[in-house]
């Protein structure tokens, strides 16, 4: 990585929200914390995306609570990587996309941009599919119409942005807590064994010795870190009004932004654990192999004998509501991440509505095409979701490695560069995640061919 200095005429990351939310470094710690409470919510939404739902619930249904430990490891890994993006954004005034373009040679940066754009599209595809399926389950809206409806999210986002970024944070927070409370209720109704749940957070040798458990554990760990979240977080932490030239204020901003991130990621961790616990408590030792998609999960909840007809109907409906909320939540964050990547790599100066419409259209079009080709076949559309998750695995090293190189660069980061122990852990994590994702890609294609 070149040691070029940050250009003074570099366009601000998400300039319409950059440096717009008040942060007074002289205020109380409580006020500072409240000032920085918000960006982590948008990031947490990405860790609760619909693409991870099936893995969690199917893992619980097949192997009980054993995989809760894998969930814990994935969340601790996410906390470390997101804290690095926080430091990058605040210390340098650049987001990850800008940094990659600015400090890598142009040909390499272009390759990284293409992969980043495809990763954003892959993320968005999962949300479009999840939202379209939720609308179909709740209101019997055809999938193709549901996919087209998701385009309207772009204009809703533009409308809300007029009233400030805090409104976006509040809406995302509302959606996250909607999902959280739905699954708290569903897990309560499913009556899991508390001792068995707690025991699931202890590592078991089965995770390594049982190929089936290992595969899903790798899926939980490897697919949890979302590329778009790294671009997103490095940008939106710059929405606060700390001094860009005062290291003391930067240090405070990093401290409270990291606290915010860790709290919100803990909430996402709870949600993903609840999904796994729900799958384990209702479907363990049953026909877990039949829980391959959202429709399967919906109908399994609806017809589960333990719940009864009335409660089964309530549980399945709430599941669809949570799926819709999760899709809308991730739609907002995915659209913003798409804008960050496009601006950061290309320096495009086009109207916000057009930029966001392009980002969303690139995700909706493949879904629409597949719906037409497969005549609305839900199983085929859910298979497209699997392919989108595979591509995210491919794309992950292309944002993790620049992040690691940048945050360990003293000339770039100043006093906020990675300490030796952070470098050791992060490089180890990056290597392991990359190996896991290669393994997942191979296994996924073997399953699809089989």
From Swiss-Prot:
Instruction: Check the record and name the InterPro entries matching this protein.
Output: NRAMP_fam
Keyword Nucleotide-binding attributed = no
A Pfam family it matches: Nramp
User: In the UniProt record, does the keyword Transport occur?
Assistant: yes
- Major site of localization recorded for this protein: membrane
Q: What function is annotated for this protein? A: H(+)-stimulated, divalent metal cation uptake system.
Q: Which GO terms describe its cellular component?
A: plasma membrane
Disulfide-bonded cysteines: none
Q: Which HAMAP family match?
A: NRAMP (MF_00221)
GO MF terms on file? cadmium ion transmembrane transporter activity; manganese ion transmembrane transporter activity; metal ion binding; symporter activity
| Protein source organism | Staphylococcus aureus (strain MRSA252)
Residue ranges crossing the lipid bilayer per the database entry = 34-54, 59-81, 108-128, 141-161, 170-190, 212-232, 263-283, 305-325, 361-381, 383-403, 422-442
Q: Where in the cell is it found?
A: Cell membrane
Topology term for the membrane: Multi-pass membrane protein
Please report which protein family the annotation says this sequence is part of: Belongs to the NRAMP family.
This one is known as Divalent metal cation transporter MntH
Biological process (GO) annotations held by this record are: iron ion transmembrane transport
Keywords in alphabetical order: Cell membrane, Ion transport, Membrane, Symport, Transmembrane, Transmembrane helix, Transport
